Structures are given as structure tokens and as C-alpha cells.
């Protein structure tokens, strides 16, 4: 079973040379710490940063440099800063190659719910709806089950939707799965996790074909 950092490390393998990548709040913000040094990647934050680096070391934080989740960040050489209108013009104009988001639920058809739990106070959906409506490549980073032990990979989302039929891949603490043919296709297992354990934790239809390798980092 993976930690949040290991989930982020696995997702970092999906980041390709030359990509412009938007990182959502939560586990996705960790991805910048694990990208290979031999590729060039531009991380974008919807609050107006292009060229985010990894988190700063303790004692080196700059309170004026934050991401959309209000966490302190570093800026790489050549980074730029701009207003939200420009930031969302980049997003809505489909200039982002990869979007990595957290989620409360993902459905087997690619629907995502990640902004509201009815009855709980929320600040709003933020930029997630713009991201899922504009991006062609969306990866979700999340735990496989919620705190009550219920699956977050469902036949249909029960929470208010952020986007419809948009998620391409999900990386959890148990597995890597793609969304294909109205089902979750199992691609990789977390080290030491069996297919049966993944099946038991997945409410949606799980497609398993051939040998399923363990994740490599």
C-alpha cells in the first residue's frame, strides 16, 4: 500500500519532456518533487504561476511564493507570474498538456467529483471545473477508499460532479488504473497488494487482463 508521496512519485512517471502540467490541491502538489532531472517540464498553478519547482527546504520558504493550495513553493529559473485571468486563459485555451487532480469519487465512465460533500461547508469548486472541461489528459491521485473504508472508484458518483467522462487514469495507494470501455482497467498493483484486495476495494467494474505487474518507481 502506497503513501501519498509514493502515489506522487508514480504519477511523476507520466510526466513527459516538454509538458505543461497543472497540479491540483493535495497529493498532486507533491508530483513536482519527483520529476526526473533530465526532462524539461513547466508546472502551472491556477493562482498565476508558470515554472513551479519542488517544495522549499525548511527555513528557505518565501511567504510570497505559494500555489493554489496556499502552500509555499519554489520558482524555477525563467518562471513567470500573472493574474488569474491569464492563468485561466491558458487553461481554457487548452495549453495544458496534463492535469493532475485529487478526487472524492471517480466513476467507471470517467466522471469526477472533487469539490463538494453535501452538508459540509466548502469554499467553492475553485478552478477544477475549468480544468476538467478543458484538459484532454486528466490523471486523478487519491486514496482507493475513504476514511470509512468505502470505495472511491464507483459505478456512478454519488457526490455533485465536477466533470463528466473526463478522467483518463487513476493512481491510488493500491493500483494504477485506466478508464476504458466504461470500466476501470487494472494496469499495475502497489507492491505487496493482490488483485483480490484491489477488487474488494473497487465498487466499479474492474477489468483484469493478463499478468498485472507491481508498480516500479
Which positions does each model-derived feature cover?
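Conserved phosphate- and dinucleotide-binding cores of soluble alpha/beta proteins
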Residues: 3-6, 57-217
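N-terminal active-site beta-alpha-beta segment that forms phosphate/nucleotide-binding
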Residues: 1-76
Amino acid at each position: 500500500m502506497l503513501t501519498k508521496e509514493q502515489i506522487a512519485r508514480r504519477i511523476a512517471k507520466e510526466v513527459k519532456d516538454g509538458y505543461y502540467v497543472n497540479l491540483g490541491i493535495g497529493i498532486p502538489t507533491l508530483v513536482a518533487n519527483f520529476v526526473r532531472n533530465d526532462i524539461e517540464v513547466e508546472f502551472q498553478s491556477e493562482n498565476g504561476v508558470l515554472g513551479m519547482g519542488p517544495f522549499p527546504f525548511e527555513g528557505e520558504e518565501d511567504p510570497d511564493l505559494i500555489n493554489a493550495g496556499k502552500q509555499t513553493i519554489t520558482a524555477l529559473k525563467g518562471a513567470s507570474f500573472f493574474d488569474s485571468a491569464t492563468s485561466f486563459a491558458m487553461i481554457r485555451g487548452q495549453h495544458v498538456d496534463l492535469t493532475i487532480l485529487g478526487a472524492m469519487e471517480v466513476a467507471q465512465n470517467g466522471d469526477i467529483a472533487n469539490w463538494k460533500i453535501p452538508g459540509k461547508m466548502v469554499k467553492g469548486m475553485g478552478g477544477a471545473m475549468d480544468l476538467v472541461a478543458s484538459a484532454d489528459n486528466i490523471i486523478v491521485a487519491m486514496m482507493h477508499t475513504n476514511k470509512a473504508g468505502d470505495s472511491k472508484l464507483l459505478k456512478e458518483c454519488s457526490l455533485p460532479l465536477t466533470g463528466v467522462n473526463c478522467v483518463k487514469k487513476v493512481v491510488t495507494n493500491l493500483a494504477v488504473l485506466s478508464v476504458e470501455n466504461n470500466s476501470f482497467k487494472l494496469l499495475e498493483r502497489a507492491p505487496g497488494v493482490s488483485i483480490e484486495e484491489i477488487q474488494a476495494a473497487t465498487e466499479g467494474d474492474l477489468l483484469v487482463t493478463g499478468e498485472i505487474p507491481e508498480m516500479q518507481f
